[in-house]
C-alpha cells in the first residue's frame, strides 16, 4: 500500500481525530472481515488495507511522521516498545470475536503469519544528511528456510493434519454455567495452533520454517534527512511463516552534529568574527557554506549578533523542492591588551564622537599622553 492515502482508505479527511479514526476502522473492519466475506479476495485485500491504515493512524508518532512525509518515503513513524510485529487490535478484539467465538488471538496461528518489522538506527555525518548518501547496512533477520522451503518438515516428508483439532488449530470446550451452556475456543496444545503435526522436523530449522540470516542491504538516503526521521524499506524485515508477508525494515536516522554549522529544520547557522573597526567601517568577508565559500559584504555600522541571510544556501527539503537558508551571525571582537598607539587612537576617536570622559578615564588619558611627551 506504498502509494495509498491512509485517510482515504478509512474514508476520512486528513487531520481526522482519534475518535473518528477508531469509529471508521471499527465500521470497515466489520464490513470487510474475511469471515463475513468468505472466498471474496477483494474484501480480504480491503481488510488488509484497513488494518495497515489503522496501525499507522492510531499511533501518535507514526501518524505524525506519516502526516509530515507521506507514504512514499517516510510513512513509518516511530517505534513503540513492542516493535512493529503483528497487528495490535487496539481494543477492537470484540469485532473479531463476533466471528470466532472469542478466539481471535489464537485463530490466526494456523494460517499465514506475517513477519516482524525491524528497526535499525543509522548514524550519518552532517554532510551525508545534507547531500544524501548510499549506505550499506548489515541486518540479522529471520528468513524462510531454504532446505525445507519454509515448511518446517524434512524434505521427502510431509505434515499431517492434527487429529486433535482436525487442522483448525483450535479446540472447542463447552461449559455449563448458571446462565446456561457456553462454548469457548482455545489453542490446540498438540499442534500449538498450527493445525498440523510435523513428524520429522527439518534438520536445518528444527521445524520452525525460518532460520536466522545476516544480510547486507543498500540504503539510499535522500538529501535533507534529519535526526528522528524514519525511513521504511518495504518487505525487508523478517520473513513470515506459512506464506505470510515479510515485515518491513525501518531505518531511524541519527545525524552527528557539525563542528561549524548549526542546523534548525532546513536552515543552517554559522558564526563569523570581525574586528571592531571592520564592523564600524564595513567589510567584505568570506563565509563558509555547505556548498563552498561565498563572499558577503558586511555593511558599515554592523552590531555584534546581527544575522544576515544567504537565501537558498540551507538544506534540501525532503520529498519537496527548494532549500532552506543559511544565516550568518556576525560577532564583533573587542580588542584586548591594546598598546599605547591603539589607546591613543581610541581616545582620539572618543573625542571626535563627542563622548564625555569620566574622571578616571580623563586622568588615564592625561598620564598616557604625558608619558608620550
Swiss-Prot record:
Answer yes or no on keyword Ion transport.
no
A GO molecular-function descriptor:
zinc ion binding
Q: Which Gene3D superfamilies match?
A: DnaJ domain, Heat shock protein DnaJ, cysteine-rich domain, Urease metallochaperone UreE, N-terminal domain
Q: What cofactor does this protein call for? A: Zn(2+)
| An annotated GO BP | response to heat
Intervals holding CXXCXGXG motif repeats: 145-152, 162-169, 188-195, 202-209
The UniProt note on the cofactor reads as follows: Binds 2 Zn(2+) ions per monomer.
Residues bound to Zn(2+) 2 are 162, 165, 188, 191
- State where the CR-type zinc fingers lie: 132-214
Where is Zn(2+) 1 bound in this sequence?
145, 148, 202, 205
What SMART domains does the annotation carry? DnaJ
- State the superkingdom: Bacteria
Keyword terms: Chaperone, Cytoplasm, DNA replication, Metal-binding, Repeat, Stress response, Zinc, Zinc-finger
Its chief place of residence is cytoplasm
Q: Which SUPFAM superfamilies match?
A: Chaperone J-domain, DnaJ/Hsp40 cysteine-rich domain, HSP40/DnaJ peptide-binding domain
The entry sums up its family as follows: Belongs to the DnaJ family.
What is known about its subunit structure?
Answer: Homodimer.
Q: What name goes with this protein? A: Chaperone protein DnaJ
Please spell out the taxonomic lineage of the organism that makes this protein.
Bacteria, Bacillati, Bacillota, Clostridia, Eubacteriales
**Gene coding for it:** dnaJ
Amino acid at each position: 500500500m506504498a502509494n495509498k492515502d491512509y485517510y482515504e482508505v478509512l474514508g476520512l479527511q486528513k487531520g481526522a481525530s482519534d475518535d473518528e479514526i477508531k469509529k471508521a476502522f471499527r465500521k470497515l473492519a466489520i464490513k470487510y472481515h474475511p469471515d463475513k466475506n468468505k472466498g471474496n479476495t477483494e474484501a480480504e485485500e480491503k481488510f488488509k488495507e484497513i488494518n495497515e491504515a489503522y496501525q499507522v493512524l492510531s499511533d501518535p508518532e507514526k501518524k505524525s511522521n506519516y502526516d509530515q512525509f507521506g507514504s512514499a518515503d517516510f510513512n513509518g513513524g516511530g517505534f513503540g516498545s513492542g516493535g512493529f510485529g503483528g497487528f495490535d487490535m487496539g481494543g477492537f478484539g470484540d469485532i473479531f470475536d463476533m466471528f470466532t467465538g472469542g478466539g481471535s488471538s489464537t485463530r490466526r496461528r494456523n494460517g499465514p503469519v506475517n513477519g516482524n518489522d525491524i528497526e535499525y538506527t543509522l548514524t550519518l555525518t552532517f554532510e551525508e544528511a545534507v547531500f544524501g548518501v548510499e549506505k550499506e547496512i548489515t541486518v540479522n533477520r529471520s528468513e524462510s528456510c531454504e532446505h525445507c522451503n519454509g515448511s518446517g518438515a524434512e524434505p521427502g516428508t510431509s505434515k499431517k493434519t492434527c487429529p486433535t483439532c482436525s487442522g483448525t488449530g483450535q479446540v472447542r470446550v463447552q461449559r455449563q454455567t448458571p446462565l446456561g451452556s457456553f462454548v469457548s475456543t482455545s489453542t490446540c496444545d498438540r499442534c500449538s495452533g498450527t493445525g498440523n503435526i510435523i513428524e520429522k522436523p527439518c534438520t536445518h530449522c528444527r521445524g520452525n520454517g525460518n532460520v536466522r540470516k545476516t544480510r547486507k542491504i543498500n540504503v539510499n538516503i535522500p538529501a535533507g534527512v534529519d535526526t528522528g526521521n524514519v525511513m521504511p524499506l518495504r518487505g525487508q524485515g523478517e520473513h513470515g511463516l506459512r506464506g505470510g508477508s515479510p515485515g518491513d525494515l525501518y531505518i531511524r536516522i541519527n545525524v552527528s552534529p557539525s563542528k561549524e554549522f548549526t542546523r534548525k529544520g532546513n536552515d543552517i547557522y554559522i558564526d563569523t568574527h570581525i574586528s571592531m573597526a571592520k564592523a564600524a567601517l564595513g567589510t567584505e568577508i568570506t563565509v563558509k557554506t555547505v556548498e563552498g565559500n561565498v563572499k558577503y559584504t558586511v555593511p558599515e555600522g554592523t552590531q555584534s549578533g546581527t544575522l544576515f541571510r544567504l537565501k537558498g544556501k540551507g538544506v534540501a527539503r525532503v520529498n519537496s523542492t527548494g532549500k532552506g537558508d543559511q544565516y550568518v551571525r556576525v560577532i564583533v571582537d573587542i580588542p584586548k591588551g591594546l598598546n599605547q598607539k591603539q589607546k591613543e587612537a581610541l581616545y582620539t576617536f572618543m573625542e571626535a564622537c563627542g563622548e564625555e570622559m569620566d574622571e578616571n578615564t580623563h586622568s588615564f588619558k592625561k598620564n598616557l599622553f604625558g608619558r608620550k611627551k
